UniProtKB/Swiss-Prot annotation:
Reported function: Cleaves peptides in various proteins in a process that requires ATP hydrolysis. Has a chymotrypsin-like activity. Plays a major role in the degradation of misfolded proteins.
Subcellular location: Cytoplasm
Record text on subunit structure and interactions: Fourteen ClpP subunits assemble into 2 heptameric rings which stack back to back to give a disk-like structure with a central cavity, resembling the structure of eukaryotic proteasomes.
Organism: Pseudomonas fluorescens (strain ATCC BAA-477 / NRRL B-23932 / Pf-5)
Pfam families the record matches: CLP_protease
A single BP term in Gene Ontology: protein quality control for misfolded or incompletely synthesized proteins
One GO CC term, this protein: endopeptidase Clp complex
Protein name per the record: ATP-dependent Clp protease proteolytic subunit
Domain of life: Bacteria
Length: 211
């Protein structure tokens, strides 16, 4: 039911020399095996792992929409471990997170850098978390283009537009002023989990689940 959604993640894990664990469920109908990610999706858990790119973004958006259709009133949990990636791919995930009815809780495991940090901060207010040894990094969008001077100018204007839009949204979700965001994203800005909380990118650093 869910397995095809994780073909890319499974392939990435296998390429790194690992195997995707399988879990077996027993019911009155017999046994059924799931890969671990598909089983967690049944619990409304989505993983955003690795660089943010179009194929991954399409899978994340599809899973968000599917879980909304399953239950529009129950939270979705998005776990993020990403170095960042494509702005347009990331914005498709962001827009879907804001569009659907369920709250999307975000949790950083490992790292949330660049677009990963932006999506972490875009979680539902009060439901944005980091594990204690996570790292968060914010910066301005990167871009490069070769060609005629007129084309370079067009792309430079687009990058400036994207930067302003990202900064505006980051200010909205973090509670910081636009001027602060512009200043603090001028260069790579790495933060500990606690520093990310103080800055407003997340709401809480969690060491373990509540009893």
């Amino acid at each position: 039911m869910f397995r095809n959604s994780y073909i890319q993640q499974n392939s990435d894990i296998q390429a790194a020399g690992g195997l995707v664990p399988m879990v077996v469920e027993q019911s009155a109908r017999g046994e059924r095996a799931y890969d671990i990610y598909s089983r967690l999706l049944k619990e409304r858990v989505i993983f955003l792992v690795g660089p943010v790119e179009d194929y991954m973004a399409n899978l994340i958006c599809a899973q968000l929409l599917f879980l909304e259709a399953e239950n529009p009133d129950k939270d979705i949990h998005l776990y993020i471990n990403s170095p960042g990636g494509s702005v347009t791919a990331g914005m498709s995930i962001y827009d879907t997170m804001q569009f659907i009815k369920p709250n999307v809780s975000t949790t950083c495991i490992g790292q949330a850098c660049s677009m990963g940090a932006f999506l972490l901060t875009a979680g539902a207010p009060g439901k944005r978390f980091c594990l204690p040894n996570s790292r968060v990094m914010i910066h301005q969008p990167l871009g490069g283009f070769q060609g005629q001077a007129s084309d370079i100018e067009i792309h430079a204007k687009e990058i400036l537009f994207i930067r302003e839009r990202l900064n505006t949204l980051m200010a909205k979700h973090s509670g910081r002023t636009l001027e602060e965001i512009e200043r603090d994203t001028n260069r790579d800005n790495f933060m500990s989990a606690e520093a990310a909380r103080e800055y407003g990118l997340i709401d809480e650093v969690i060491n373990q689940r509540p009893a």
